């Protein structure tokens, strides 16, 4: 099992102390590290494979290729990977081919920003944005200006997006909120002395023909909202989410339950973090150490001083609009296989779910128990951190 989710504890705990909203994508971090590992060797590669829970680079690349294939199969899912290379470097052919085949990465040779006479970044260079995606849609361009120092030679860029689910009503695709989800359900838990409630919202998946896919081949996305009973229970809840194996998916409600009243505030915010410091604390320090990093499998003409990762930043955004603030009732989960055929267990009494104090949320792929995003809301009125 990889350790990417543990970065959320270091960054998320700081955000709680600062009373800030927070969101983090372990999936996007894993994608970036997996691509970087393709160009690593020696102790650097060993550390990265151990951190990502893979025995060999071929296993890691196969996993990345499988995820990319799934992302490309569904129009709701978007994944982008770009490698920006200074003109002075030439990437190894094997690195470029693996980056494209297993990670969806495409590269561009460009002149990265240089400092002017006052030390500021030269603004003459145009903004660059590369995407490897299944279809072509208008997209926002991201500039490198102000983000890249004069000594930078390679920039990796990753982007993943799970936009709001959509339904097809004959007049085109329109965004939908949790009211249009396939089913909603909730449950109450007690874990290591901490009581909390979980609200689960499943969403429809629409195929490229515009039809809702109910088949077993469709990914099954849902949002889980974790509400601690105690107002100050968020930090304890976050610690369990990142340290207990499969905690998030183990807390998925599985019993039939009515949830009323059920209210979640609308919120919209983004947060960013420099993952390098957190990764070093977790034992992945070699790629960020100028004296220890070994990225010799990336470029043919690696500089004498070598290459290392100076910064690894991640910025995520989330929005739950007014359409999704109130769920009237919970729907039902499938019958538990522990019951004999024909027997229906007694329905528990209704559960209220009113998120009026800090809560945690996760966006997961239910079938594969994969956490795509993990975050918390301290103040829903704050938009950007």
From Swiss-Prot:
GO cellular component term, pick one: extracellular space
Region annotation RCL: where it falls in the sequence: 324-348
UniProt site (Reactive bond): 338-339
GO molecular function: serine-type endopeptidase inhibitor activity
A Pfam family it matches: Serpin
Domain notes: The reactive center loop (RCL) extends out from the body of the protein and directs binding to the target protease. The protease cleaves the serpin at the reactive site within the RCL, establishing a covalent linkage between the carboxyl group of the serpin reactive site and the serine hydroxyl of the protease. The resulting inactive serpin-protease complex is highly stable.
Family listed: Belongs to the serpin family.
Protein name (database record): Putative non-inhibitory serpin-Z11
Protein source organism: Oryza sativa subsp. japonica (Rice)
């Amino acid at each position: 099992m990889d350790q990417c989710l543990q970065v959320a504890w270091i960054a998320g705990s700081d955000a709680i102390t600062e009373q800030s909203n927070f969101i983090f994508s372990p999936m996007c971090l894993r994608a970036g590290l997996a691509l970087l590992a393709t160009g690593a060797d020696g102790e650097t590669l060993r550390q990265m494979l151990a951190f990502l829970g893979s025995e060999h680079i071929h296993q890691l690349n196969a996993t990345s290729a499988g995820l990319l294939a799934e992302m490309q199969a569904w129009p709701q899912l978007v994944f982008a990977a770009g490698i920006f290379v200074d003109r002075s470097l030439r990437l190894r052919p094997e690195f470029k081919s693996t980056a494209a085949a297993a990670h969806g990465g495409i590269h561009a040779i460009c002149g990265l920003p240089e400092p002017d006479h006052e030390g500021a970044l030269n603004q003459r260079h145009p903004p660059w944005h590369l995407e490897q995606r299944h279809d072509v849609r208008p997209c926002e361009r991201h500039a490198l200006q102000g983000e890249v120092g004069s000594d930078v030679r390679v920039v990796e860029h990753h982007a993943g997006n799970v936009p709001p689910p959509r339904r097809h009503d004959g007049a085109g695709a329109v965004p939908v909120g949790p009211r249009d989800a396939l089913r909603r359900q909730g449950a109450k838990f007690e874990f290591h002395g901490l009581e909390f409630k979980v609200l689960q919202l499943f969403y429809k998946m629409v195929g490229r023909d515009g039809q809702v896919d109910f088949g077993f081949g469709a990914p099954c996305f849902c949002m889980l909202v974790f509400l601690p009973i105690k107002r100050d229970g968020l930090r304890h809840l976050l610690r369990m989410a990142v340290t207990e194996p499969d905690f998030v998916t183990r807390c998925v409600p599985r019993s039939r339950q009515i949830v009323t009243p059920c209210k979640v505030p609308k919120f919209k915010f983004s947060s960013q973090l420099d993952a390098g410091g957190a990764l070093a604390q977790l034992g992945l320090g070699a790629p960020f150490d100028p004296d220890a990093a070994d990225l010799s499998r990336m470029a043919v003409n690696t500089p004498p001083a070598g290459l290392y990762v100076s910064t690894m930043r991640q910025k995520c955004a989330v929005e739950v609009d007014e359409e999704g603030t109130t769920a009237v009732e919970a729907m039902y989960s499938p019958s538990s296989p522990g019951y004999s055929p024909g027997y229906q267990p007694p329905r528990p009494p209704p559960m209220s779910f009113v998120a009026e104090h800090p809560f945690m949320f996760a966006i997961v792929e239910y079938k594969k128990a994969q956490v795509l995003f993990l975050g918390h809301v301290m103040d829903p009125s704050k938009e950007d951190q």
